[in-house]
Amino acid sequence: MKAGIMNRRQFLKSVCGTALGAAGFPYIVPSSALGANGAVPPSEKVVMGFIGVGSMGGGHLRTFLGYDDVQVAAVCDLREIFRQRAVERVRRRYGGAGCKVYRDYRELLAREDIDAVTVVVPDFWHALIGIEAARNGKDMYYEKPLAMSIADGKAVRNAVNRHNVVFQFGTQQRSDDKFRFACELARNQKIGKLHTIMVGSHPSVTCPNQPNHPTPDKDEFDYDTWLGPAPWAPYTYERCASRAMGTLGMWTFIHDYSLGGLGGAWGVHPVDIAQWANGTDDTGPVEIQGTGVVPADGLADTAIEWEVEHLYANGVRMIHMNTKTALKRAEQFSLNNGLGVLFLGDEGWVLVEREFIDAEPKSLLTATIGPDEVHLPRSNNHRRNFIECVKSRRQTICPVDTAVRTDTICHLDDIAIRLGRKLRWDPEKEQFINDEQANRMLSRPMRSPWYL
């Protein structure tokens, strides 16, 4: 909130706090507004809007609807079927109207009564919507990835910090005890000196048999608006279908729209944990080199196999791989089908994934982190952490300054694969060293009339 401006919750508190007028005449204030009978008063509720309510966005909507201190006031989606499904769910929860439906996210963001939003849209829309949300003073729960380029991610960071809004990146593994504990084992040298981090990520998929020629737009879908800032391409159903439509969201594996498994489709999650354990949330690697396999035919053209090595200034190596490659590189990955983050020290190792943690020696699994050792921030619920920070104005467990560093690594990996050579990176200046070709890949043009 900008200085000198009263927000909605403060206004409601002031109204309730002055229920007796200047002449001593009592205003009539409903008991629910004062929190009677255990009800959360409106002054303590976070009013939310939801931008993107398909598969993942709809999941967020269901969760936030369950919080008594959240009021869902608006939903927005380009597809009518998603909008109607979402608003019907909200109205069932609240027993009637009170939730408005939008097709244009800008109209939702212009509402002064909305405190916070979720941003759960195709990757190439993230930066535009995130920056507009920040300009409108909206706190945001923002799904990964941060942006379609390193330059756009920095622009999101600048907007969030300039407008002082609360930001939670959708890397919910930071709110999982297993991941925090594994990182604390590494940070406190319980495995000895950390020297290598291996990351196993879900790969992208291929779609050689999917049509990449124009097909009729059977559902009257506004394809031009959906494309937005992305390069023009002929419409096909598969290009822009989503999981909520009962099919795989193929756009996730098209390089004009996403980095696929290397980035927002999965890689951001384990890379984020690698950064946390390495103590490098405010920086990044200094060298990057790797190879990958990129499909030559069909719609999908994000890397399906990759192995990218990063060297940090502290001497730690981080190797980001798809699951198939991870299984070949380290036998520990066979414990979990190639997924997870493996921390290797000179006295032991720990491997962690969402449903799994293992270590050697086994005594590490019951190790105690002492009071004078490194204790990482604790959150047991990523969405609740966001709501509590909206209220307290404190920093979330994964703020934008952390998010941009993780997101950057995924883009560095993609650039290294496509250039096929070693790259030197300056994490302070956030640019490649003496490499004009690589630096040109730090940004992507946007299709007119869209711009940041």
Residue ranges of model-derived segments:
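NAD(P)-dinucleotide binding in Rossmann-like oxidoreductases
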Residues: 298, 302, 306, 311-380
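C-terminal helix-rich "cap/oligomerization" subdomain common to oxidoreductases
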Residues: 14-42, 300-301, 388-452
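Short basic (Lys/Arg) and small-residue
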Residues: 144
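Rossmann-like dinucleotide-binding domain that binds NAD(P)(H)
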Residues: 224-316
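N-terminal glycine-/serine-/threonine-rich beta1-alpha1-beta2 phosphate-ribose binding loop
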Residues: 1-139, 151-166
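C-terminal structured subdomain/cap of oxidoreductase catalytic cores
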Residues: 53-60, 344, 350-425
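Active-site rim elements
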Residues: 169-171, 256-264, 292-297, 369-376, ...
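A contiguous active-site-proximal alpha/beta segment in oxidoreductase catalytic domains
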Residues: 139, 147-225
